[in-house]
Amino acid sequence: RIGSVGMLWACNGGGWLGHFISDSDIRNSKIKRLLEKGEIEEFYVESVKNPFYIRSEDTEYLNKKSTKKEVKFLAPLDNLLWDRKMIRDIFDFDYSWEVYTPVAKRKFGYYVLPVLYGNQFIGRFEPKQYRGEEELRLENWWWEDGIKINDRLIEKLEEGMNRFCNYLGAQQVNKDDWNNMVLNR
C-alpha cells in the first residue's frame, strides 16, 4: 500500500482503507514489522508532526530534485489523493471529489481535476468533452491562492493540456474557454 501511494503516514485515512489495515493496531504492528525487516523507512516532512513511511527501495527519491517541472492533471481517484488529510497537511491543498455531492452543496464542481506543477498544486479545473465534439471544454478553472502566473507556467500548462487532450482523443481545448478561464484570471 505504501508503494502504491509513494509514501504514507500511519494516521487513519483513505490511504489505508481495505487490506485489513484500517484498524490502527493492526496497521501499526505491520509498520513496526516492516521497519524491523528493513522493507520500509521512516522520515519526516517539514511542518508535519507525524512520521511518514516509504519503501526502502524508493528512498533515493527523497533527496532527488527534479529539474523537469511538468503540469499533471490528476484523476479524482489517483493514488496520491487517497488520503485527503495527508495531501492537505503536506501541500496545503484541500480536495474533495464532489461527484456525489448535491449541486447546491458543491464548492467547485461535478468532476474537478487537481492541477499539479512540479511538486505544487496550482489549481483545479472541470473539463467536459461532449459526444461528437472534437474540442475539450473547460466548464470552470480555479487557481490556488498565491500562484504567480508567468509565461513559463502558461507554456507548461499548454503542454499539459495538449497531452490531456491527446489522451482523451480531443483535438484541442476550446480556445475561448482557455483564454477566458485560464489566461484571464
Report the location of each language-model feature:
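Long, charged, low-complexity, helical-prone intrinsically disordered regions
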Residues: 1-185
